[in-house]
Amino acid sequence: MKIGVVGLGFVGLSLTSVLSSKGYDTVGIDINKDKCKKISKGISPFFEPELEKILKNGLKKKLKISNDFSLINNCNFLFVTVGTPQNTNGSIDLSIIKKAISTIGESLKKNKKKPIIFVKSTVTPGTMKKIILPILEKKSNKKAGKDFGLISNPEFLQESSAIKDTKFPHVVVLGGYQTKFMKKAKMFFMKLHPNIPIIITNHETAEMIKYANNSFLATKISFIN
């Protein structure tokens, strides 16, 4: 099995490092060439406890870091972890994820493995169906549910415990259609995280769960301050 992670920020690099350290054939992709060179040397572009240790362990195994998107052409699983920053008016800027999804859609044309695409980036409810799914189908000329799977897989990491949260999440949320792809995804996470509860729901609910979690954390932080 080959796994690709698109976007090597806080979430993406933590996920890439953990997956590769567990022995998965993993490729981490980022458009920033300088960042990729740094990570390839085992140096994290930001501080996170245990991250560099896990990263170096992965690099000794099957981990590859690159800005070459063609490396995801033959992946079985693809995790999208690019940033979705806020605009000045409080709305989410989807320009980065749209560009990443367009590139992934192009790669689907050459991918004969019927991959599953997991979107971990924070997006507003409805984004998967109204924006991401149409882009993927248009660029790839393939159909979701038949030629590839598309699943919302929100993350719940916190700074200073990202590696721990990636290794031992309190829950795994999978949002999407009840197809063979969902069954395959569930089996993967059951193996990756034994004894961790898995919630299977639709895209919108998975997106909303992420937003509710973010709101809870923001409220918690405000009380601490």
Please name every model-derived segment.
Residues 19, 41-44, 92-96, 131-134, ...:
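Short, glycine/charged-enriched secondary-structure capping and boundary segments
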Residues 86-156:
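Rossmann-like NAD(P)(H) cofactor-binding subdomain of soluble oxidoreductases
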